């Protein structure tokens, strides 16, 4: 509504501008203004009053256009931001349901790019399209109709200009279209290399391979730079082309229009109408330019949308049963049984573990010993269904784990990863990890994990800050805090 009214008002404005010019060109009595009284006398005179009234109407229209622009921008931003927020939430929820197979398929760096850069691209496009897709067609069609009404023969100049501009814009559009997908893939690669370099910074320094890592980043950087320069250089023709077409159109209208004014009796064209025709021609060309910009943005937005939909449309391999079993924690014994379990990774030729059978009895400790790559970690990852067994079954208290609800299964497991993973926040936050645990429970968990001593050596004890990834504590301390978190669960 705001956009439609704004478009109509902007189309009305040139009419009043031409009317103001017509009134100003009329012969008037020579008048001097020596004070405010003379100004009011001038305002009330029959010669000058139409000029003041027309100028006043123009001022009111401009104020309304400004108000409507502010309101429309507010709602556009609100809709675009809400869209991006919901999309991020849906993508995050979907990623949470992925098994490690799906995580390996997409890679963490690619998922980060999709949930940040790609959604940001779509947000910007939605914001842009809301502001221009509805307004500019109204402006373009309205300006062309008004130009034809003023003088149909001179409007042919506008038609030729619009067709020429459209051909140029489509040519540029076709040239740069394939490069948008390449840019997004390079963004994934850039995130991957940067993430590897930053997370492995200590290893890089210890091996004195800074130059080697810099060369890897520079290679991706150079590819990105080349594509950005090409796209920027090609798209850079748009605005100069627009300026050229606008200038030539105005020149042609003025040239042919002046000839028509010389024969006013035949054509009925006057200077005000010539100005009006020039104004509407400029508005039509500008509107076409903005409409084309929308279509030029489509490929980049389409690439981002496809990448996001690839995440949202992927069906997780590991699913919950339609009527899952919910076990009560207090009634669970905790017996885990593997019956002839075989597992191989997605797209792998060989199985990592084959025909494994054992029973981990409740209340007893079961340990796995084997060489590197023998499948110890893989076997453990099958219990919380980070992966699903290719063959055989795994049971908890004689119930197959694929029959259990995810909430029930996860509530039974205290998981401590090989590499201690901590989150930004305090030590207390990391041990409690979303649970409303009291101080005594948190401290008891830390004590059992043999982490109480080093925690209490910190100035703020349990309120000490942990940086992202736990980089401000040692590897052993991270492991103790991870164990405490699992115990507290």
Language-model segments: residues:
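An intracellular "coupling" helix at the cytosolic face of ABC transporter transmembrane type-1 domains
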Residues: 97-101, 117-126, 130, 134, ...
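ABC-type nucleotide-binding domain
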Residues: 329-489
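Helix-loop junctions and hydrophobic alpha-helical segments within the transmembrane domains
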Residues: 91, 95, 204, 308, ...
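Transmembrane helices of ABC transporter permease
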Residues: 1-7, 58-65, 128-183, 254-269
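Transmembrane helix-loop-helix hairpins at lipid-water interfaces of multipass membrane proteins
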Residues: 1-68, 148-153, 262-271
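Alpha-helical segments in transporter systems
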Residues: 1-19, 54, 58, 73-77, ...
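Helix-loop-helix
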Residues: 146-160, 173, 230-307, 311-312
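Juxtamembrane helix-loop junctions of ABC transporter transmembrane domains
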Residues: 9-25, 52, 57-108, 112, ...
């Amino acid at each position: 509504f705001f956009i439609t009214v704004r478009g109509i008002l902007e189309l009305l404005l040139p009419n009043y501008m031409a009317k103001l010019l017509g009134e100003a060109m009329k012969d008037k009595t020579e008048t001097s203004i020596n004070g405010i009284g003379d100004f009011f006398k001038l305002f009330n005179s029959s010669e000058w009053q139409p000029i003041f009234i027309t100028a006043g109407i123009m001022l009111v229209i401009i104020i309304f256009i400004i108000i409507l622009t502010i309101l429309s921008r507010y709602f556009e931003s609100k809709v675009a931001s809400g869209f991006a927020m919901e999309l991020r939430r849906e993508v995050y929820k979907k990623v949470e349901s992925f098994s490690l197979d799906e995580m390996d398929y997409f890679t963490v760096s690619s998922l980060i790019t999709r949930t940040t850069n790609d959604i940001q691209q779509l947000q910007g496009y939605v914001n842009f399209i809301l502001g221009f897709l509805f307004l500019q067609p109204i402006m373009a069609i309205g300006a062309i109709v008004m130009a034809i009404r003023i003088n149909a023969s001179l409007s042919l100049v506008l038609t030729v200009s619009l067709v020429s501009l459209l051909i140029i814009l489509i040519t540029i559009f076709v040239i740069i279209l394939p490069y948008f997908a390449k840019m997004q893939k390079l963004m994934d690669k850039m995130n991957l290399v940067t993430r590897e370099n930053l997370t492995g910074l200590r290893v890089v320094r210890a091996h004195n391979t800074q130059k080697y890592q810099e060369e890897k980043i520079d290679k991706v950087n150079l590819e990105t730079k080349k594509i950005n320069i090409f796209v920027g250089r090609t798209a850079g023709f748009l605005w100069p082309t627009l300026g050229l077409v606008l200038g030539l159109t105005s020149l042609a209208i003025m040239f042919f229009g002046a000839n028509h004014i010389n024969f006013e009796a035949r054509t009925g064209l006057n200077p005000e109408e010539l100005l009006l025709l020039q104004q509407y021609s400029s508005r039509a060309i500008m509107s076409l330019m903005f409409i084309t910009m929308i279509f030029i943005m489509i490929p980049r937005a389409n690439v981002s949308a496809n990448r996001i939909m690839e995440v949202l449309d992927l069906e997780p391999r590991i699913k919950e049963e339609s009527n899952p079993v919910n076990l009560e924690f207090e009634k669970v014994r905790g017996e885990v049984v593997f019956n002839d379990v075989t597992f191989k990774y997605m797209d792998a030729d060989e199985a990592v573990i084959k025909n494994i059978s054992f029973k981990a009895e409740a209340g007893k400790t079961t340990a796995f010993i084997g060489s590197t790559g023998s499948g110890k970690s893989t076997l453990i990852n099958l219990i919380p269904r980070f992966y699903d067994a290719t063959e055989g079954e795994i049971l908890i208290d004689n119930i197959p784990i694929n029959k259990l609800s995810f909430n029930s299964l996860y509530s039974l497991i205290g998981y401590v990863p090989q590499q201690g993973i901590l989150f930004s926040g305090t030590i207390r936050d990391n041990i409690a990890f979303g649970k409303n645990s009291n101080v005594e429970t948190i401290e008891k968990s830390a004590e059992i994990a043999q982490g109480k001593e080093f925690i209490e050596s910190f100035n703020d004890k349990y309120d000490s800050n942990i940086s992202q990834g736990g980089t401000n504590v040692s590897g052993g301390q991270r492991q103790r805090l991870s164990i405490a978190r699992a115990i507290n669960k």
